[in-house]
UniProtKB/Swiss-Prot annotation:
One of its GO terms (molecular function) is ATP binding. SUPFAM superfamilies: P-loop containing nucleoside triphosphate hydrolases. ATP binds at G1344, S1345, I1346, G1347, T1348, G1349, R1350, S1351. InterPro entries: AAA+_ATPase, ATPase_AAA_core, P-loop_NTPase, Uncharacterised_Ycf2, Ycf2_N. Coiled coil: none annotated. It comes from the Eukaryota. This is Protein Ycf2. The lineage of its organism: Eukaryota, Viridiplantae, Streptophyta, Embryophyta, Tracheophyta. It comes from Cuscuta reflexa (Southern Asian dodder).
Length: 2003
């Protein structure tokens, strides 16, 4: 993966570097200068930090690199796009509309009326909306004022509560099915169309509440009014009609509700005190790190309706994790779970996916009404937790975590018509009545349900009632059938009869349940033997409880009938008889029972593993603690109940014995859980401090400073931050907590639990007091509060705060936790105070004081005067405030406050209000108190505050890269942006117009919206959008608007969307304008078509079209990329649309074009981009040649040329899409077919009346020649495209005769005119006979060795011609089933006559014919490919390929066909079919001599392999041989390549020291690569003239880029290595050779590409022979210099050796030196000794001479073996390998790292293999081996083309495709056997020692004989092994063992003198270089400066390297 990423980076860099090669881009590049300057600055660290200065940033935006002013339009556009990108990122990565303000399950709308109460009366606030109605639960009833019934009976005085009277009940997975979904959607549409209107509709669907029912809602604080998403919201729509008589007990209406506030206030204080203590004491974080812990499969079969009880789910997860977790992990989890059971209000842990689930009926109104007045002393901390969490937001939180949880929809069906009554019970025994009422309400709830799971859950809840001494069975009679229902608690039967009588009995259902259980356990056998005992104990207790403690239902019925009457029971029976029948089906019972047993089994397993969890459980059912009531334990059977609990695992302890945490106390009896005596496994391991810190008092009415309380220790600790110096501050702190949370209740009542869950999930861990981050002082300390770590006033930091200031940061953080996201502190003080006024309008004194205390303070301390004024004005003593009696009585008990409350100095850490804001608040304070609001705000004050905040942002900008500074700056920036949006919303009226228009559009469209999009819209967000206009209109009114409508994040989101729409609206019309302008031009041009009726114009136009065929204009490639981007944008929008609509769309509906564009324009490299540069052509000749044609005809001709053939393009698209997407096409053939399908008849036009080759002239004056064959082929193509190929000259005509002679002599004898114009007749021309064939040849065979540029020549001709160019790949036609040859009649191909051809004369019919038959042909091809297993079908396909290509070529004639590597079509049994077809087509084309003009060019580098049938007079009858490029030809080639792309060479280029001195490789590919590099540099430098320095830079860049191809290492010592190489080159080589480029580096570069053997041999030959110019010693010194410099200059380190050996070039220097010495010995030692070296005596170095001649074969063998590194061949590696200590992967990696870059196999005579025939014909079958992997059985096919390589990994070790090329012995995870190794021919008489031995390589002996012997007849046997494995499937170890063994033998045979010679040479070289570097002290600095100046090194690299 790392290598792939590296390759991608390298390719991207090349693309970006050469992307400027398009000349159109040169103009647009100037527009990017400002962006380029910014990019340039980003790479300089010191400049980058300066960007944070706004002045510098503004200058950069206004200037470009040249210092001139930049394009303002471009700058503005760039800034707009940048802002758009930032907004998109912000929307995606931040909750712009906070999720806490949205309903988490908002798939359906919650009925919330848009109208707000005009008055502040309580009655009007109740019915307005859910939120308003629920918000009154904290309000205080005015003294002596009751709720009037008139309000409920008069609809005109109320606001409508829109309810849904028809609802379906189904799980979420079934929402999209059935009629119930239609009902929901219908209700949803009705809701959307009526819920948000400003006025009540004419016929509103309003169900009003009776006063008693309203009181029922008020009295039950845990009841929420929500119609969806919870099965516990059963009472939602049980409202009665106004006309019905109420049966409510009206005496409850007169009771005030002050007890709610009183009890709540005290418990809030208790809870918050403990929370603040935990914040200081413990580091609060989540335990769970296992993602499996938090995730539950959505359709887990074990997750049934039981797990709606969160404890069930918890036990299930415990049971699962017990198999994997260690004992310590289970201990930690159990400890936390113990706390969760004992103090759940303090534990919210997402790891358990558990929170306290407050039942809707858990704290009924009657209990509060009766018990709260008495202020009983035995209430525990959690008693009022249902008040805190009254809105059951845990439902939302729990549903998000447990994905399986089924969301239920409360259902009602015409309740008003059935005239139901709300049942309210008033009984002295409150709990009994509550349970009875819950039973009846549950029965009513399921009246229309038909879902078994829903009813099952309902009965679960019913039997989990809070009565442990009672179990019910309810028998209903109304039918003769009775079916048992199994529940985990009891067995219930329902018998329904017609007489509607009641009979209630208890059954012995436990026996049947136990029988099933025993049967189940017996089947499990041994697995449950241990657990069976636990089962028996539980069922015994269950039987005792069910048989002895039964309370007959008849008694319960009597009690209820006294208060309710018989009508309710009749209604219940009627409903049950209609709705419960589905539940009693046998299938449902079976499913229910199976689920029950599965759960029981898991629970018993959980208990058996010593995980005794301290929770209340009954039988085998654990019961959630919030659903447990112990109020009846004082009855006569309490002893039995206690025994039951103790037997299950709980110990009942009285309070007098211990003081543990209270579970719940309603009466005088105390029921407590002891957390430390039940399980010895856990009792001693739970820290005592946990229970001590969480213990609470038994009497909550006492003050907080009680000494015997555990909590009192927290507040009386002097070293504790919660204990301020003065008691006054303590009360102030307590008050701040209360006030903050009070405001929380008032603003977001239903989200407080979600915040607690989010903020306080913790595991117990002692926090560390850190003294770091003291830079920002108080700011950091305050900020760290949110990370739940305190360091305030701890240790030495105590001096930061004085006595008064100690409490201020704490109070401010209390406010910051709960206030800022609700009361956004912005400059819009009018908006803030308006919100506060809403709260002040309510009769709540404490809230008023909290607002003054928190809001009216600022970041700066108040003066004494200000404090006095505020206290006198707002903070009056309690006695001076008109408190109600109940509040006056209760207030001192729960809050120790006096008249001096004290003003908190609040530092809003995320706002930092300025002093102006503070004074502004003070000024507005009086108006707030009096109820007056200012409706306008001064413009200057708003923007001045905004500017001050912006200045504050600039001040802290340098601290952006610190974590604290980043958070702070983010807050400031978000605040500024939000404030700016709010200011603009009041200044710009267009936004309101947009809102109004959007509102009207949405009103119309919403009713027509598809069903599936409505289910995806979040209801609250939609509600906010629709109400936005109404909100702005009532912005200054006093109304209870939901706070999230006022939040700045919402408006930021809203205006961001508007901004993005404006940007999109700008881009869209721009392109629409372009389209409209093009359309208008088209209309103008169409008018000229009328002139086509004139015959003269028609004739002229036909002439023009014949001479100048219409062509496609060159399109800018960036335009195509833009089209791709637009298509991708369209695709993404369709995907988003499909996702939003619930469709399964994966891609676009028409994704063909995107596929084509991606393939065509994104898979491009630098060379392809350069090839896109158009050629410079003049159009003057066109005007000259068409001067006699009328203007009208020219205009029509231009119109036709511009016209795009829509039909033809459609055909191309259809063909190409079918080829690209059809699965029936093989991958090998896909590229070939795509090429054919993309061909069109319209090509680029060149002026054919002029000479098309402008490059044959030699304007430079320097000798540049072309090869004769290239000249002939170029003129032949020119004649062909001028339609002269089939022209029959009339030799009797003198004019035609002269023309023909001129052309013939020019073509035939052009090779004699070197350096002259090719049209000049040579004076020494040979006589010419007119009897020869007058027409030129149509078949050309181009031969030449690899590297001569055959493919480049043909492609060059194709580029300069305007006729179609078709490539035919012969290897695609090879028949892989030769046994079918006899079944195919080749003569059938002769039946193809002219009628099958496509007539090109009538171009208009071509498209029609293709269009008509295209679908049939494509269908036929698909069908044919699907039946390829058929023999005849395979033969037909083989025939189709060759036929299709030639038929297309004939249809598109004149065209050129190129067949590379035609020698593959040899005469043999496997490809005779394709060869015969090819010969047949060539013969037919030649014999016809029809107007079909096809020029066939074939190329090969092995002419001996070409079949004689192809070389015939009427086939490939002309042979052109290309030789290696000479120096003048290289220059010509370079000149041509550069000139065709619009670049020229400077005049002094051809001087002696200029271009002539630069040596380019003889390979054509080298010249092309160099040309591309030069052009990329020229375009970057904006030069059109190429100079010598540019070419040298390109050469050096190619050499220097070596370091990017070697794998990257962290060792920067390679810089010294590079400098050392440069020093040695500059000192030793450049002065002698005048060659500034290191030849060894060029050799390495060429070796990496393996460019050719002769080229390599040339270098070695120069080393051995040209002693006057270069010596081997200099090269040895140059290769060694890098390592020596690295050793001398680099600092020693622990990994010094690793640093040296980790770099490829450093390691290969040694291999290169050794190879040079071996080569020198092979060339010099074999030919001469000391005495016969007279030719080189003067310059010869005696050090390198041999005392005696050596065997050249031994020297060559040793030289080729130098590829193996000495470190790898050491005895250590051998021993490690033999012992198995060295992994094969390590050996393979070492081989790759240290072998690839070495001169792997040197073959001095390898270049001769081209010239002499290869009798074995290795080149043919070597293709079968290419890419064959020995280690992996995988085939790597390559195209037979000169430009293809074999690449391996990122090293790009490339191997040329040729018979005797150098193939590397090693590749990444591959071994390539080189059959063309010249050593095969050298060592024919003995086993080849340099390569693998035959027996160890081949799997078949016969195969090895056929490959390794010189018997030509054995070639035929090769095809038998075509599909067999060539190599032995050996393991890696055997290969490495063989290599080591072979190298050991070679090393043993080598002479000792050679090894000593190496040592002496290298040691002397090292000594010489050391002295050189040490003596030249300034040399390092000079070379460093030179490298920096040449930009070969960069300062950052030097800084890293020299530090």
């Amino acid at each position: 993966m790392r290598h792939q990423v590296k390759v991608c980076i390298l390719e991207l860099r090349e693309i970006m570097r050469e992307i400027h090669n398009y000349y159109y881009f040169l103009d647009s590049w100037t527009k990017l200068n400002s962006v380029g300057s910014l990019i340039h600055l980003f790479f300089r660290q010191e400049r980058f930090f300066k960007l944070f200065d706004t002045r510098i940033f503004s200058i950069l935006l206004s200037r470009n690199l040249q210092g001139s002013p930049s394009n303002r339009y471009f700058t503005i556009k760039g800034v707009i796009l940048f802002v758009a990108g930032v907004l998109i990122y912000r929307i995606n990565n931040q909750n712009m509309v906070e999720r806490k303000s949205l309903h988490l399950t908002g798939l359906f709308p919650i009925p919330m009326n848009s109208t707000e109460p005009i008055k502040d009366r309580l009655e009007e606030a109740i019915g307005s909306s859910n939120i308003n109605r629920l918000s009154i639960l904290l309000l205080y009833f005015p003294k002596g004022k009751n709720i009037s019934e008139r309000y409920f009976l008069n609809p005109k005085e109320t606001t409508g509560v829109i309810t849904i009277t028809k609802k379906g009940s189904m799980p979420e997975s079934n929402w999209n099915s059935g009629p119930s979904f239609k009902i929901l959607v219908t209700d949803f549409i009705a809701y959307l169309t009526s819920a948000f209107r400003e006025k009540i509709p004419k016929n509103p669907m309003i169900n009003l509440m009776f006063p008693g029912e309203m009181e029922d809602f008020i009295g039950n604080p845990t009841r929420s009014v929500r119609p969806f998403c919870s099965d516990r919201w059963s009472e939602l729509h049980l409202w009665t009609n106004p006309t019905e008589k109420s049966t409510i007990d009206h005496k409850f209406v007169k009771n005030p509700l002050s007890f709610v506030r009183g009890a709540e206030n005290k418990e809030i204080m208790n809870l918050l005190r403990i929370i603040t203590y935990l914040q200081k004491t413990f580091s609060i974080h989540s335990i769970s790190s296992d993602p499996r812990w938090d995730s539950v499969p959505k359709h887990d079969p074990d997750m049934d309706s039981f797990q709606k009880n969160s404890l069930f789910f918890l036990f299930h997860r415990f049971h699962e994790r017990n198999r994997f977790e260690s004992e310590e992990r289970l201990q930690e989890m159990t400890e936390l779970f113990t706390l969760l059971i004992s103090e759940p209000d303090l534990v919210y842990h997402k790891g358990f996916s558990f929170s306290i689930y407050i039942d809707s009926y858990g704290l009924e109104k009657k209990k509060l009404l009766n018990e709260a007045r008495a202020e009983s002393k035995n209430k525990s901390l959690w008693v009022l937790s249902p008040i805190l969490f009254r809105y059951e937001e845990i439902e939302y939180f729990f549903q998000r975590i447990i994905q399986k949880r089924v969301r239920w929809i409360s259902c009602g069906n015409g309740l008003a018509d059935l005239k139901q009554k709300m049942v309210v019970f008033a009984s002295k025994n409150i709990m009994e009545a509550v349970n009875q009422s819950r039973l009846i309400q549950n029965m009513i709830q399921i009246k229309s349900s038909t879902d078994d799971g829903y009813i099952r859950n309902l009965f679960n809840r019913f039997f989990l009632l809070k009565k442990y001494d009672r179990n019910f069975e309810y028998r209903m009679q109304g039918d003769q059938k009775g079916t048992p229902i199994f529940n985990q608690r009891t067995l219930m039967k329902c018998r329904i009869k017609q007489d509607h009588t009641y009979l209630y009995k208890w059954s012995d259902g436990t026996q049947s349940l136990q029988e099933h259980l025993e049967h189940f356990l017996s089947e499990q056998k041994s697995g449950f033997k241990v657990q069976k005992r636990y089962f028996q104990v539980m069922f015994d207790q269950l039987r005792i409880c069910m048989t002895k403690n039964l309370i007959h239902w008849f008694e319960v019925r009597k009690k209820v009938e006294k208060k309710v009457g018989k009508n309710v029971y009749k209604l219940v029976i009627l409903l049950l008889s209609k709705s419960l029948r589905f539940f009693f089906l046998p299938q449902s019972l079976h499913f229910f029972f199976i689920k029950l047993l599965r759960f029981v089994t898991k629970f018993i397993l959980f208990l058996s593993n010593s995980l005794t969890i301290f929770c209340v459980s009954f039988g085998n059912t654990p019961i959630q603690r919030s659903e447990i009531y112990i109020s009846e334990l004082k009855c006569s059977n309490k002893k039995l109940c206690n025994q039951l609990f103790e037997s299950i695992g709980f110990q009942i302890v009285h309070l007098k014995k211990l003081k543990p945490l209270l579970l719940e106390e309603y009466d005088t009896y105390n029921f407590v859980i002891n957390g430390g005596t039940r399980s010895p496994f856990l009792s001693n391991k739970i820290p005592k401090r946990i229970f001590d810190s969480l213990s609470t008092r038994t009497n909550h009415s006492k003050s907080f400073d009680k000494k015997d309380s555990c909590l009192s220790k927290i507040f009386h600790d002097k070293d504790n931050w919660l204990n301020p110096p003065k008691p006054f501050h303590t009360s102030s702190l307590i008050s701040s907590f209360y006030k903050a949370n009070k405001l929380r209740f008032r603003s977001h009542l239903h989200h407080f639990l979600f915040y607690c869950n989010k903020r306080f999930p913790f595991s117990v861990e002692k926090a560390r007091n850190t003294n770091s981050h003291y830079i920002y002082g108080q700011f950091l300390n305050i900020l760290l509060f949110r990370k739940k770590r305190f360091s305030l006033c701890v240790g030495e930091k105590k001096h930061v705060f004085w006595s008064r200031a100690t409490i201020s940061p704490i109070e401010s953080q209390v406010s910051n936790i709960f206030i800022p996201k609700d009361f956004i502190q912005s400059d819009d003080k009018e908006y803030n105070l308006d919100k506060y006024f809403n709260f002040l309008s309510q009769p709540d004194t404490v809230i008023r004081r909290a607002i003054y205390s928190i809001v009216e303070t600022s970041g700066t301390p108040l003066t004494e005067t200000q404090k006095g004024d505020l206290e006198r004005t707002y903070c009056q003593p309690l006695s001076d405030i008109n408190l109600y009696d109940s509040e006056v009585n209760n207030f001192p008990e729960y809050l120790n406050l006096n008249s001096n409350m004290g003003l908190a100095h609040i530092l809003f850490s995320d706002k930092y209000l300025s002093s102006e804001n503070h004074s502004l608040c003070l000024k507005k304070g009086a108006d707030v108190h009096k109820g007056r609001m200012s409706t306008t705000f001064q413009r200057d004050s708003s923007f001045s505050i905004l500017s001050e905040k912006w200045n504050l942002f600039q001040t802290y900008l340098p601290s952006f890269f610190t974590s604290t500074g980043y958070k702070y700056l983010t807050l400031i920036f978000g605040d500024n942006f939000s404030d700016l949006l709010l200011i603009l919303s009041r200044r710009v009226s267009i936004f309101q117009e947009i809102l109004g228009l959007s509102w009207r559009i949405l009103q119309i469209r919403l009713s027509k919206m598809p069903l599936f999009i409505r289910s995806e819209i979040s209801s609250q967000w939609l509600h906010n959008i629709l109400l936005s206009k109404e909100k702005i209109r009532r912005n200054t009114k006093s109304s209870l608007i939901s706070t999230h409508l006022r939040s700045t994040k919402f408006w930021e989101f809203f205006y961001s969307i508007i901004f993005l729409l404006l940007v999109a609206g700008y881009l869209g019309p721009i392109y629409i304008f372009f389209v409209s302008r093009a359309f208008s031009e088209l209309q103008t041009e169409l008018k000229s078509l009328k002139s086509l009726r004139i015959p003269s114009s028609t004739i002229e136009l036909r002439k023009l079209l014949d001479k100048y065929p219409r062509s496609e204009p060159n399109s800018f490639w960036l335009k195509n990329i833009f089209l791709v981007v637009m298509e991708q944008l369209r695709d993404s929008l369709e995907e988003i649309k499909g996702f939003a609509f619930g469709l399964n769309r994966v891609g676009p509906t028409s994704g063909v074009n995107s596929i084509r564009f991606k393939n065509k324009y994104f898979n491009i490299n630098g060379i392809d981009i350069i090839d896109l540069i158009p050629f410079a052509h003049t159009r003057i000749a066109f005007s000259i040649n068409t001067r006699h044609i009328s203007h009208t005809s020219k205009e029509i001709y231009s119109l036709i040329r511009k016209r795009k053939n829509v039909n033809g393009v459609w055909i191309d698209d259809k063909l190409e899409s079918w080829v690209a997407n059809s699965d029936s096409i093989h991958e090998e053939e896909r590229k070939f077919l795509v090429q054919l399908s993309a061909l069109t008849t319209e090509k680029r036009i060149l002026l054919s009346l002029t000479h098309s080759d402008h490059f044959s002239k030699n304007d430079s004056g320097y000798q540049m020649i072309e090869q004769p064959g290239a000249i002939y082929l170029r003129y032949l193509v020119d004649i062909h495209q001028k339609h002269l190929m089939n022209y029959e000259f009339n030799t009797s005509c003198l004019a035609e005769r002269r023309i023909f002679l001129a052309h013939s002599q020019t073509i035939t004898y052009s090779q004699t005119s070197y350096g002259t114009n090719s049209f000049h007749f040579p004076s020494h021309g040979k006589p010419f006979s007119l009897r020869l064939a007058l027409s030129p040849s149509r078949g050309i065979l181009v031969i030449g060795s690899i590297g001569t540029g055959r493919s480049y020549l043909v492609k060059y001709l194709a580029t300069n011609s305007y006729v179609p160019f078709i490539t035919v790949f012969p290897n695609k036609f090879l028949d892989k089933n030769p046994q079918f040859i006899d079944d195919i009649d080749i003569d059938n191909s002769n039946n193809i006559d002219a009628s099958d051809d496509i007539d090109m004369d009538n171009s208009d019919n071509i498209d029609d014919d293709i269009d008509r038959d295209l679908a049939t042909e494509l269908e036929l091809l698909t069908w044919m490919n699907a039946l390829t297993m058929d023999r005849e079908m395979k033969a037909e396909i083989a025939r189709l390929f060759i036929t299709l290509q030639f038929e297309l070529a004939r249809a598109m004639s004149p065209c050129i066909i190129w067949i590379p590597n035609i020698h593959d079509l040899d005469v043999n049994e496997s490809n005779y079919l394709s060869l015969g077809l090819l010969v047949n087509h060539l013969s037919r084309d030649c014999e016809r001599c029809s107007p079909i003009n096809i020029l066939v060019i074939a190329s090969t580098h092995i002419p001996q392999k070409v079949d004689p049938a192809l070389i015939a007079p009427k086939k490939l009858n002309t042979c052109i041989k290309l030789r290696r490029l000479l120096i003048p030809q290289q220059r010509k080639y370079f000149f041509t390549l550069s000139y065709t792309r619009g670049f020229h060479l400077e005049n002094k280029m051809f001087h002696t020291n200029g271009f002539g001195s630069i040596t380019m490789g003889p390979n054509a590919r080298d010249i092309v690569a160099l040309t591309n590099e030069v052009l990329s540099i020229s375009i970057t430098q904006k030069k059109s003239i190429i100079d010598t320095n540019t070419i040298r830079s390109a050469l050096h860049r190619q050499t220097w880029d070596l370091q990017s191809q070697v794998r990257l290492v962290q060792d920067h010592e390679i810089l010294f290595y590079q400098i050392g190489r440069a020093v040695a080159q500059n000192v030793l080589i450049s002065n002698l050779s005048n060659c500034p480029i290191d030849p060894i580096s060029i050799y390495l570069k060429n070796k990496s590409c393996n460019e050719g053997d002769s080229y390599l041999y040339k270098w070695y030959f120069e080393l051995g022979t040209s002693m006057k110019k270069l010596t081997i010693l200099l090269y040895l010194l140059s290769c060694t210099a890098g390592s020596v410099a690295q050793d001398l200059w680099s600092l020693p380190g622990p990994d010094e050796k690793n640093g040296i050996t980790s770099y490829g070039l450093v390691e290969n220097d040694s291999d290169l030196v050794h190879g040079l010495l071996e080569v020198e010995g092979a060339l010099v030692g074999s030919s001469r000794t000391e005495k016969n070296c007279s030719k080189f005596e003067n310059d010869r170095v005696t050090l390198l001479l041999r005392p005696e001649p050596r065997n050249p074969l031994e020297r060559m063998q040793n030289g080729s073996c130098s590829i193996l590194d000495q470190r790898f061949l050491s005895e250590k590696y051998e021993s490690e390998f033999e012992e198995g200590a060295l992994a094969p992967q390590q050996i393979e990696e070492d081989l790759f790292n240290h072998i690839v870059w070495a001169p792997t196999i040197w073959r001095p005579w390898g270049f001769l293999c081209i010239e002499r025939p290869n009798e074995l014909g290795f080149s043919y079958w070597s293709r079968s081996f290419r890419g064959k992997r020995i280690l992996y059985d995988e085939e790597d096919e390559l195209e037979e083309n000169d430009s293809e390589f074999l690449q391996s990994g990122t090293m790009q070790y490339k191997t040329r495709d040729r018979s005797s090329k150098e193939k590397g012995l090693f590749r990444i995870s591959q071994f390539i056997w080189d059959p063309a190794d010249p050593l095969f021919f050298l060592f024919k008489d003995r086993p080849p020692g340099s390569v693998f031995s035959r027996l160890e390589l081949f799997a078949d002996e016969e195969m090895s004989k056929g490959l390794l012997t010189s018997q030509t007849s054995q070639i035929e046997h090769l095809f038998r092994y075509k599909y067999t494995r060539w190599f032995i499937n050996k393991t890696q170890e055997k290969h490495f063992e063989f290599l080591i063994h072979r190298q050991r033998c070679l090393r043993t045979n080598s002479s000792l003198s050679n090894r000593s010679f190496r040592s002496n040479t290298l040691s002397e070289s090292y000594q010489y270089l050391s002295n050189l570097f040490l003596s030249n002290g300034t040399l390092l600095d000079q070379m460093t400066k030179t490298l920096l100046r040449k930009r070969w090194l960069f300062p950052d690299e030097m800084k890293i390297g020299f530090m």
